[in-house]
C-alpha cells in the first residue's frame, strides 16, 4: 500500500515502489498515487541504472533460490552497487526450526553463508543483511 514509499517521500526522497497486488495499489496511501507500479522483482519495470538506491526488506523469500538470484540481479540492474536487501536467515538448526514454524509463506530461506552464495551468483554488489534469531 506504499507505506515505505510514503515514509521516504516524507524525508524528501523521490521514491517509487512495486507490488504484486492490484489491491495494494488500488488502496494505497493517497500521497503515493502514481508512484506505485504493479510488478514483481523478477522483471522490474524500470530502465537500467534508473535509481540511486533500491531496497528489498523480507520479500524475496517468497521465491525459489533460483528466482531469488534473478530478483537480486534485477535490483542490481536498476541501481548497481546501491542496494540494500534484507533476507530471512538463521544460524543454528534450532533457529531454523523456529523460523519454519513462524514464517509459513517463505519459499526460500537459508543460513547466511548460503545467502552469500546467492548474492554472488546474482553478481550483486550492494549491501545485505539477514533477519535471524539473534
Regions found by a protein language model. Name each.
Residues 59:
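Hydrophobic adenine-recognition pocket in adenosine-nucleotide-binding enzymes
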Residues 55:
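A conserved beta-strand element that flanks and buttresses the S-adenosyl-L-methionine
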